[in-house]
Amino acid sequence: MDKLDMLFKKQYDLQVQGMHYDFANMTTEQRAAYVKEYTMHCEHEMHEALQEIPFFKPWKRYDKDAVSEKNQVMWAMARKEFVDALHFFLCVAIGLGFTPDELYAMYCDKNAVNYDRQKDQATYKPSADET
């Protein structure tokens, strides 16, 4: 079992055993509500991660020396919040019905498209199925 499989399994087990979700018997409406709820949680945690990053707020005056002294702590806090978001991201992936292999395959396909886009940005025009 690879690490992505393990992450999915751990999160699935938490959702089923700890949170008592029954994915096999969810109605379409329940599944949609689940995905919506966990997407919002993921967005919230990502916003918290952003707030920990030095110089996040463009309108705020930062003391560069103070930021430098707290730099490692700030990045560590951002990483912690990112891991919180990852839990919710995995919940969304599970709610959407992804398996680790499907997510990996779709990621690789999209990554190839993104590389193609970068090769010639000036002339690239996405097809309808690439968006």
Predicted segments with their positions:
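Flexible "arm" and connector segments at domain edges
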Residues: 1-131
